[in-house]
Amino acid sequence: MSPQTETKASVGFKAGVKDYKLTYYTPDYQTKDTDILAAFRVTPQPGVPPEEAGAAVAAESSTGTWTTVWTDGLTSLDRYKGRCYHIEPVAGEENQFIAYVAYPLDLFEEGSVTNMFTSIVGNVFGFKALRALRLEDLRIPTAYIKTFQGPPHGIQVERDKLNKYGRPLLGCTIKPKLGLSAKNYGRAVYECLRGGLDFTKDDENVNSQPFMRWRDRFLFCAEAIYKAQAETGEIKGHYLNATAGTCEEMIKRAVFARELGVPIVMHDYLTGGFTANTSLAHYCRDNGLLLHIHRAMHAVIDRQKNHGMHFRVLAKALRLSGGDHVHSGTVVGKLEGEREITLGFVDLLRDDFIEKDRSRGIYFTQDWVSLPGVLPVASGGIHVWHMPALTEIFGDDSVLQFGGGTLGHPWGNAPGAVANRVALEACVQARNEGRDLAREGNEIIREASKWSPELAAACEVWKEIKFEFPAMD
């Protein structure tokens, strides 16, 4: 036996497999202010104790592997390992537990959402000892937050750029989402902006297809913006989707948007990736562009209740990576979203400091230490009858986006925009006068429609529209 082998054996190295909980389950651990804290919903396989399952998550998302390795002796596991420090059963669910894991900050590269997610939600989600695993929430320490730029501008700077205060902003996604020529697309943009909307939007899958190349779309939309601004005296914008197949092409499109003098561009941050998104956010801050973020693909990740990742985690990641707007659900439209849970992550997007509140899905107190806020965007199956509820639920710091609810107006695009603007102004005025939007909302809309034929026509078209499907899961 060589001296080296004898030395290693003498310090206690023993090859083989041992339970994760012996090393990674530490219920006496006191979390540090610099730790990243994670709350996982864990569903162990039959026969796997919850402590072992929670420890396995901590191990496989930090320093652990399936067997003991001799190179463990070359570093300090106590310094670098993740720790499962608390486990609690999920009320009303069989064999589901919330496992709380603390990660030392040294495990993560500064300013990199990509690296953070590669560790915390990487290979561990395919681990055989778990039937299902869901990341419910993260506590990002202030020391780590300060390594990120965050949103290019934030809520207050955006309002100052647009000179719009005291109300939600209004938007519209141009439909049909695919198939229009650039000129017809620009015409729809102009009509909606002229009618009273603040923004129009590329749909998330509008990039640079054969029927409408990106440069042509950018040019016709810029023309529409300038014409609408001249006629209305208001600052207008269109979310020009810069998402592309490469980061270089994405930046090239953003550069062209800046050269046209438009105020805002757009990115699909999940399909485009966090590295690309952070690069674009940095470019937007340096060059005075606002950045609208679409969350296409989020439901693949967040819709299952016991596996994947809750959108509040994706929302926190977006605030770190950078974006001035992000889609957040509506509570009232065609897309899924529970009111209290949705408002929980809306507050995580906008506010500087958010207290732990399990009733709203917030597992940890979060301090954003001066990182700018993000405007939540309510979009998907909403129309004028929803305006009172949306105004009450989301408040002033939001974007209310009506696609079909604008372009589906029987008189055309501009009257559809007029109807939405009148409905919004009526709701804001009623709220400022002390009226109860939740109780008097329909009456407020009916009163406003008496002096707005465009709103009256919209009210008639969408009076019976509902999106109610029984939930089977």
UniProtKB/Swiss-Prot annotation:
GO terms for cellular component: chloroplast. GO terms for molecular function: magnesium ion binding; monooxygenase activity; ribulose-bisphosphate carboxylase activity. Its EC number is 4.1.1.39. Gene3D superfamilies: Ribulose bisphosphate carboxylase, large subunit, C-terminal domain (3.20.20.110), RuBisCO large subunit, N-terminal domain (3.30.70.150). Binds 1 Mg(2+) ion per subunit. Heterohexadecamer of 8 large chains and 8 small chains; disulfide-linked. The disulfide link is formed within the large subunit homodimers. The modification Phosphothreonine is found at residue 330. It is an enzyme of class 4 (lyase). The record marks 334 as: Transition state stabilizer. This is Ribulose bisphosphate carboxylase large chain. Mg(2+) binds at residues 201, 203-204. The active site is at residues 175, 294. The modification Phosphoserine is found at residue 208. Keywords: Calvin cycle, Carbon dioxide fixation, Chloroplast, Disulfide bond, Lyase, Magnesium, Metal-binding, Monooxygenase, Oxidoreductase, Phosphoprotein, Photorespiration, Photosynthesis, Plastid. RuBisCO catalyzes two reactions: the carboxylation of D-ribulose 1,5-bisphosphate, the primary event in carbon dioxide fixation, as well as the oxidative fragmentation of the pentose substrate in the photorespiration process. Both reactions occur simultaneously and in competition at the same active site.
